[in-house]
């Protein structure tokens, strides 16, 4: 169970999202706290990415409300919604760096679009953001010269360019090897600690969940089945979330890692 006394930065009330006649999210209510790392998980097609897109205004709900910092998110034609969404950082699964631009130019884009800062100040901010994601020497490189992990870090620097209080990450470890994925997890922890921001991560990677999650939001077939601290989920003896851990652990790409034993011992 979530703590009703904590300060929330995102509040979702009775959210319903439909595609045609199909209900993708059914009566979802939850809160994301200030300075936490929240992991949204569930099987493929359960509505994880749909929930993320609904929060950031990319999908209009059938019913229900979403608030970010007490501002209701409506649609991207609403001035107040646009204003608050400019403050939100998003790291999409593919990273989407522009190949014809250097890393520095990619990271500078949000600053050029949404501020009137002089080029010299933008350059300083870009260097700071690249340092924050451990890419201090990558400014003049092009995306094609970067490894998969470096591309994710560069995209993360761009997402942080405007100093957002809230960062959404959609499957950040997708396509990464175990070592690089673990490094990205450590980076997210460092960013949360040093910048004090709220980070919402959509993932199904068990080791990432164990390492970074303060709270988890578990979806199944569009319904919210668990919403609370990771330790409470691991204490459960049965139920859909336990079945999820058991079902995914043998096929997890980290199966040979000793850290996987943590989940094996906690879900028996």
Positions of PLM-derived features:
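Conserved ABC ATPase signature
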Residues: 142-146, 150
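Conserved ABC ATPase "signature" region
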Residues: 119-137
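A short, proline-enriched helix->beta-strand linker immediately N-terminal to the Walker B motif
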Residues: 161-165
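ABC ATPase NBD coupling module
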Residues: 73-89, 233-236
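Helix-to-loop junction immediately C-terminal to a conserved catalytic motif
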Residues: 56
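Catalytic Walker B motif of ABC-type/P-loop ATPase nucleotide-binding domains
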Residues: 167-170
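Helix N-cap at the start of a conserved alpha-helix in ABC-type nucleotide-binding domains
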Residues: 178-180
């Amino acid at each position: 169970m979530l703590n009703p006394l904590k300060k929330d930065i995102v509040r979702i009330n009775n959210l319903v999202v439909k595609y045609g006649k199909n209900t993708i999210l059914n009566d979802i209510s939850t809160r994301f706290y200030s300075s936490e790392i929240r992991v949204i998980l569930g099987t493929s097609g359960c509505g994880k990415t749909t929930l993320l897109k609904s929060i950031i205004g990319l999908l209009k709900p059938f019913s229900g409300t979403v608030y970010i910092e007490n501002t209701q998110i409506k649609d991207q034609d609403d001035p107040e919604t646009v204003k608050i969404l400019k403050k939100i950082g998003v790291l999409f699964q593919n990273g989407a760096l522009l190949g014809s631009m250097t890393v520095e130019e990619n990271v500078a884009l949000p600053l050029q679009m949404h501020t009137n800062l002089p080029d010299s100040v933008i350059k300083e901010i870009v260097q700071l953001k690249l340092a924050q994601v451990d890419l201090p020497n990558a400014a003049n490189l092009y995306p094609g010269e970067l490894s998969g992990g470096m591309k994710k870090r560069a995209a993360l620097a761009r997402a942080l360019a405007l100093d957002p209080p809230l960062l959404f990450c959609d499957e950040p470890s997708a396509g990464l090897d175990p070592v690089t994925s673990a490094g990205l997890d450590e980076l997210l922890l460092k960013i949360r600690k040093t910048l004090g921001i709220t980070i919402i991560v959509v993932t199904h990677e068990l080791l990432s969940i164990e390492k970074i999650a303060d709270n988890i939001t578990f979806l199944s077939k569009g319904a919210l089945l668990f919403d609370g601290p990771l330790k409470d989920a691991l204490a459960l003896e049965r139920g859909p979330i336990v079945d999820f851990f058991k079902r995914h652990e043998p096929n997890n790409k980290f199966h040979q890692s000793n850290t996987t034993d943590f989940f094996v011992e906690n879900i028996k």
